[in-house]
Amino acid sequence: MKKKLIFLFLMVYVVVSFSQSQRPNIVFIMTDDQSAIPVRTSDNQNQSRPFGFNGDDKVHTPIIDDLASKGIVFSQAYVSTSICTPSRYAMLTGKYAGRSEGKSFISSFPLGKLSRTANNIELEENITNLPRLLQTAGYTTAFIGKSHIIDHDILETYTQGTNGFMAYSKTADPYSTTVSNTMKFNHDKWSNRMKEFGFDHVNAFYPGNLRELFNNDLNIHNVEYKNKAVLDFIENTNEEPFFIYYSETIPHGPAPYWENSNGYYAGLDADVNLTAEGFLTQDYSYLPSRTDIKNEINGFSGKDPRHAWLRWFDHAVGAVVEKLRAKGKLDNTIIVITSDHGDFNKAKATNYEGGTKVPLMVYWPDGITTPRTYNELVQNIDFAPTFLDVAGVDTSNITLDGKSLKNVLTTNSTAVIHDDLFFEIGFSRAIRTKDWKYITVRYDDATNTKIANGDTFSGPNGTQVSLPYYIPNTSLGSLGAASYPLYHQKDQLFDVANDPYETTNLFESNPEKATEMRNLLRSKIVDISR
């Protein structure tokens, strides 16, 4: 009740310290499942790659790399949870996902109970968040792209015609006008629902992953479709300042870099007219054709043609930049490019670096005077405090776990923002300093009883395993466990400064550092306990 009263208070009184004309527009651009760690020759080559500014020389992202060279690159950027939904929650609230009081999460893990953070997190109906606060401060807010942060209970069944949605099958033909109209109806219903969480405009909306459109033909990426929605918003809004949450679906599965047996990629080879609204024809001539993009990358010696999707996305970012420039809004717009989490060497849904470390660059001509690389720790919980700070919003009565990066952006500051970072995923928690990381795996009482009794747990494809994975998603869990031999170890200590791939557990051999890091994690857990 207290939080609801705070929210209602904030809705009528937000302190704004800058005039409307001074406050920057914010364009927050996020990929899906993209690590910041370059892929080595010894690694599996058939996995997502980062941007060129992250040091990967097999990709071609000249537009994004140019923005990075004129802005700030954050070399030590992390997410607090290395899976989609909780990471996005942290970005839109400035809080650790384990604090969520969303209906699905709180029903499974009431306050005071050990939680298992996974894709069970949702934005709350009546608790303040970033877009709601920005709305109250006079910002026009827009949501474009993937959600996965509301109404999980509805998401699983909506295409069966539940909750006021219209039904269609996985094999329904989106080229059929009747089917496409049904898909359009559902898209618009989802979009209107998303508006209730603080967004004035919602378009090109995906309620979850591509497969959660529950149609075989629509299980493809469409960069142009989402990009045009962003450009249309910028073109048609005369309101300033504005905040755009631009959430791409690439490179999440179906991976746009995976070539099937017929030489087909579920992105650049798909029909540009297949969208979250069904079959929709629009003018995308402002972008190079998909064939031209593939040919461009194929023409570069030393580049990996499987990752032409990165140039596809790069062109989309360039289109946003040019639209802002044409409207005279580029200089006073903050452009952020990052990802919801990584998946380097199958570290998604773990607390290892490959899952938690993400690309991050910020471009802001009016605000950033000295382009550079910032080498201190930052985390996705810092986005909301930063955006609220530059918007002039008083956050003194708001629960925020993150810290504002405004001074890093607007001065030459190299000051440390975080001495340490906290991570949570399912049964695992972790703490990381600049040089060390401690990971712990702890089960709840019911799970410990099953283990003691010799019971087994669900594995992938109907198999049984002796120990549970961190999260209920057995596919992700099995990939992480197979890729990281230490996955199930109760206590893991890594000298990440010298062992960045976390191959050697020093918990037993360095008891002094182990005790220090364990106490640090305990203190953090106490501070954020629900």
Give the positions of each predicted feature.
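Active-site-proximal cap/lid insertion segments
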Residues: 24, 31-58, 185, 189-196, ...
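Polar, surface-exposed loop/tail segments
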Residues: 91, 146, 150-155, 331-332, ...
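Bacterial Sec-dependent N-terminal signal peptides
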Residues: 1-22
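Acidic, His- and aromatic-enriched active-site or binding-groove loops in soluble protein domains
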Residues: 98-103, 158-206
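C-terminal, low-complexity/hydrophilic appendages and adjacent surface loops
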Residues: 352-353, 424-504
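Active-site segment of extracytoplasmic enzymes that catalyze sulfate/phosphate-ester chemistry
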Residues: 28-29, 35-129, 133-143, 152-163
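Structural recognition of the beta-strand scaffold that forms the well-ordered cores
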Residues: 27-30, 38, 73-79, 84-85, ...
